[in-house]
Amino acid sequence: MVKSAVLGFPRIGKNRELKKATEAYWSGKTSAEELLATAKQLRLEHWKLQKAQGVDIIPSNDFSLYDQIMDHSFSFNVIPPRYRLSGLSSLDTYFAMGRGMQRAATADKAAVDVPAGEMVKWFDSNYHFLRPEVSEETDFKLSSTKALDEFLEAKEAGIITRPVLVGPVTYLFIAKAAKGSSIKPIELLPKLLPVYVELIKKLTEAGAEYIQIDEPILTLDLPQEILASYKEAYETLGKIGKLILTTYFGSLQSNADVLKGLPIAGVHVDVVRAPENLDRALAVLGENQIISVGVVSGRNIWKTDFQKATAIIEKAISAVGSERVQVASSSSILHIPHSLSGEDQINPEIKRWFAFAVEKCAELAILTKAANDGPASVRAELEANAADCKARAESPITNVEAVRERQSKVTPQMHERKSPFETRYAKQQASLKLPLFPTTTIGSFPQTKEIRVTRNRFAKGLISQEEYDAFIRKEISDVVKFQEEVGLDVLVHGEPERNDMVQYFGERMEGFVFTVNGWVQSYGSRCVRPPIIVGDVYRPAPMTVKESQYAQSITSKPMKGMLTAPITILRWSFPRDDVHDSVQAQQIALGLRDEVLDLEKAGIKVIQCDEPALREGLPLRRAEWDEYLKWAIDAFRLATAAVQDDTQIHSHFCYSDFNDIFDAIQRLDADVVSIENSKSDMKLLNVLSRYTSCIGPGLFDIHSPRVPPVSEFKERIDAIVKHVPKDHLWLNPDCGLKTRGWPETTADLKNMIAAAREAREQYA
C-alpha cells in the first residue's frame, strides 16, 4: 500500500508558543526546565496532530529550539572553542552559538563576550541556519542524543516516527573552515561518518524502521569531489539502517546518477519544483527501493491540484508498484504557517484556495487514500478540490486589466537613471553636504511593547485615526531627536508605524491578502507573517509619504525615505504559482516607482529601497542565474530610476554571500548600498574594491545583543578603508534595529559614531 509522509513540521506552535517560551528563558523570566517542558509538549502535540490528519509516516528530530543544523553541530561536538565557556550550562552554550553572549564579570564568573555564529539562508528559502565551523582539530563525537531522545518520546506516546537527520555530505558541504584552518570541510568525512554510524545504530536499535536522511545539496551544481563522497558515505551508512535519502527544492539533473547502486532504502524527490525529478529518480532506483514523491508543496500555501498530483502518483505506482511508493510533502513544511483555523478574516472566496501545514497533512492523506482505495473513495474531496482550483483560475481577483496594460507599456528607457553615478554623486554631495564617513542606520528602530500594543489597538478599532497618528508622530519625533543627539548624519523616521518591512507595503497595495496567525520561523525565535500575493498588484495611493515628510519637517538633516524593493516583497511573500515571478516583480516595481516619485516631490532627497532578498532569489542552478538577474535588476531599476540626479538612491542587502552577485549589485545603479558584513568575519572586504559607487559594510551585528567597543568599530573601519575609497565609505549597522532593545541600540550607535569621529580625524 502507498503511504503518506511529512518531511518536517513547523515547530513554533499554533500560537508561537516556542518563540514565547524561548524569549522568556533568554530574559530570565522562566527556567530551563520550563522551556524544555514547553518544547516537549509542542512535539507531542505536533505528532498527534499529524497522526489525526491521517499521515502515515511522521517525522521526529525535525524540532529545534533554535536551528536544526545547529542541533547537528551540537550533537556532533562541533562547538567552536570560543563557546566552550566555564560556568555555562549546555543549553546556554547552545544558545550562545546562535545568538552570541555578552556578560559582565562577577565575583565568581569571568566576563563573556562572544559573537554569534555565521547565519546563512537555507538554500533559496526564507529560513536561516547557523553555519557549522570545522577545522583539523574538530573532535567529532556523539555528544548529544537528541535524535534518539525525541524518537523515544514519540514511541512512548504510541507513535513510531521516522527520525530526520541532515546527511553527512550536505552537513560538511554547508560547513566552513574555522578561521586559521585551510581544510576543506568535506575532507573530514572519514572522521564524521563514525558518528553517523553510531547514531543510526542507536535509532535502529530503538525501533526506527526507517530514517530520513536529508541531502538537499543534490539539487545544486556540485564539484566532483562532493559527488564522489556519496558513495563513500552511503556505502557505509546504508548498511547500518534503512535510509530514505531525501532531496528537495530543485532538480537533481545528472546528480541523480550518484544514487544508483547505493545501499539505501529509498529516495525522495521534489516534483512540485522539478516535475522531471520523478523520471530521474525512477531511472536510478534499485529493484526494491522506495520512491517518495513530493507532490504537496512544503514551500507555498496554495492548495495542491489533486488532478495533477494524482497523475504523478499513478505514474510512480505503475513504475514500481504501490508497496514502494510514498506520497509526501515536497520538503519540510516548516516553511508555511501552522493552520488556516482562525483565519476567518480572509475573504472566503480566496481562503478556499489555501492549504497551510495542517491542511497539507490532510491533503496527503486524501491523495494516499485515492491511490490505495481508488478515486471513488474520496470523490467528494476530489470534486471540491477541482472546484476550488477552477474558481481560482477564473476569479477576477487574479487578473486586473489595467495592471497588465501598464506593464505592456514599460520601455527599456524606464530602467535608466538620467546620468552616470559620478555626475549624480557630485550633485548629491553639493546638496546634502555630508562629512567624510557619513553615518546612518538601515531604517527601523526598536519597536517597544508600547508601539506594538498601540498599533494593535488601532487595528482593532480601539483608538481613533487621530489618536494613532498623534502617537506615531510622537514616536517619530523621539527617534529623530535621539539620532540628532547621538550624531548620526542621515536620519530615518524609525518606522514605528510598520509591523513588517514587507507586510506594511502589501497592506497598502492591491493584490495581497494577510493572515492573523500565519507565522513562520525565520531564524531562532524570529518569526515572520508573510503576505500572500493572490492577484495582480498595484498601488492605489501613497504608502509612506506622510511619515517621511513629517520626519523631514522636524530636522535640518537629510531624512531617508524607506521602501522595500520588488524582489524582497516578492520573495518574502507567498507568491502566486499561476504566473511567473518576473510578472509579479514588475507589477510591484511599478507601484514602487510611483511611491519613489511621490517621496521626491515631498522633499525627500535620500530614498532607500531595500533589496535584501536579491541573492536568495537566485535559482539553485547557475545556468539559470542570468535570466533571473536580468528581470530582478530590471525590477529594481524600474522602481528607482525615475528620480532626479540630486536624489540619492540607497539600497540594503543582508544574509547573503555577495561574491557571486557583486556585479549584479553594481548593475542596480544605486548611489549607496549597505550590506550585512559583520557576521561573515568581514570576508566581503576582498570584493569591495570592485564596487564603484558608495558602500556601507555593516559594522555591527544587530542579531546579537553584544555591543562592540569603540576600538573594534575603529579596527573594522581601518580594515575597510584599505579596500574602499574613503570618500565612498558609509558607516552603518548591518541591518535594521527593529528587534533590538534601546539600551544596546544606544550603546552600539554611540560607539559606532565615536569610531567615525576618530576615523575622520585620522583620514581627513
UniProtKB/Swiss-Prot annotation:
* Record GO biological process: L-methionine biosynthetic process from L-homoserine via O-acetyl-L-homoserine; methionine biosynthetic process; methylation
- Recorded metabolic or biological pathway in which this protein acts: Amino-acid biosynthesis; L-methionine biosynthesis via de novo pathway; L-methionine from L-homocysteine (MetE route): step 1/1
Active site location: 703 (proton donor)
Q: Which sites bind 5-methyltetrahydropteroyltri-L-glutamate? A: 19, 126, 500, 523, 526-527, 572
Query: A Pfam family for this UniProt protein?
Result: Meth_synt_2
Which subcellular locations apply to this protein?
Answer: Nucleus; Cytoplasm
Give binding positions for L-homocysteine.
442-444, 495, 610
In the Enzyme Commission scheme, what number(s) does this protein have?
2.1.1.14
Q: Which GO terms describe its molecular function?
A: 5-methyltetrahydropteroyltriglutamate-homocysteine S-methyltransferase activity; zinc ion binding
Q: Which UniProt keywords apply?
A: Amino-acid biosynthesis, Cytoplasm, Metal-binding, Methionine biosynthesis, Methyltransferase, Nucleus, Phosphoprotein, Transferase, Zinc
Cofactor(s) needed: Zn(2+)
Binding-site residues, L-methionine: 442-444, 495, 610
Catalytic activity field: 5-methyltetrahydropteroyltri-L-glutamate + L-homocysteine = tetrahydropteroyltri-L-glutamate + L-methionine
> Where in the sequence is Phosphoserine found?
182
List the record's Gene Ontology CC terms alphabetically.
cytosol; nucleus
Function of the protein? Catalyzes the transfer of a methyl group from 5-methyltetrahydrofolate to homocysteine resulting in methionine formation.
The cross-references to NCBIfam families, in alphabetical order and at most eight, read: met_syn_B12ind (TIGR01371), PRK05222.1 (NF003556)
Stated family? Belongs to the vitamin-B12 independent methionine synthase family.
What protein is this chain from? Answer: Probable 5-methyltetrahydropteroyltriglutamate--homocysteine methyltransferase
Species name for this entry?
Schizosaccharomyces pombe (strain 972 / ATCC 24843) (Fission yeast)
Per the UniProt record, the lineage of the source organism begins with: Eukaryota, Fungi, Dikarya, Ascomycota, Taphrinomycotina
